[in-house]
């Protein structure tokens, strides 16, 4: 029986990242498991503000999707370390997509600029109203997917004392339980 190891985001080292083989889903899209030290990545985030869970209705019989944006607070040391870890992960994924372009994209070689253009950023900054460029002085956010497959949630939420506030395999009321809250998050 394996045990789950949870890493604090401030201790996360992108140099431990490894990848699984590309998998093709029923719709033809590809996904690649991202692992740390050969295991699933389980990160514990510092207290982070969120505007709640978003529900995106699936088209043509596709299942609904759920996500939430976590707001970084650059003035908070723990949050800044979490941000730095996510920016480092984002950079590593772009670099490794160039190295693995043949396996991942079926292209012999791509240049970093192409990989970056194909990439949808994980860490997002609001746009400057005048220039349309990212406002790097603002507090960025990180969008995370929340798994719900065939009505089964793949997320557990706990309060500050470690007591469960939401356990997986519960109804879609999760979207209403954490709206506008600040909570530490373990991303599995």
What is each of the regions a protein language model found here?
Residues 1-153:
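OB-fold ssDNA-binding interfaces and closely related basic DNA-contact patches used
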Residues 128-188:
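Extended serine/threonine-enriched, polar tracts that run as long, contiguous segments within proteins
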């Amino acid at each position: 029986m394996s045990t789950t190891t949870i890493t604090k985001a401030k201790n996360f080292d992108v140099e431990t990242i490894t990848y699984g083989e590309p998998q093709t889903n029923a719709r033809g899209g590809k996904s690649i498991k991202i692992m740390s030290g050969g295991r699933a990545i389980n990160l514990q985030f510092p207290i982070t503000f969120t505007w709640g869970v978003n529900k995106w209705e699936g088209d043509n019989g596709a299942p609904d999707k759920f996500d939430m944006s976590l707001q970084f607070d650059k003035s908070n040391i723990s949050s800044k370390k979490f941000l730095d870890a996510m920016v480092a992960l984002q950079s590593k994924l772009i670099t490794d997509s160039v190295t693995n372009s043949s396996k991942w994209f079926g292209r012999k070689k791509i240049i970093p600029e192409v990989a970056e253009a194909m990439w949808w950023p994980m860490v997002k900054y609001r746009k400057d109203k005048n220039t349309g460029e990212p406002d790097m002085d603002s507090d960025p956010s990180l969008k995370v997917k929340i798994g719900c497959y065939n009505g089964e949630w793949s997320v557990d939420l706990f309060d500050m004392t470690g007591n469960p506030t939401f356990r997986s395999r519960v109804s879609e009321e999760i979207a209403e339980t954490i709206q506008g809250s600040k909570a530490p998050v373990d991303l599995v």
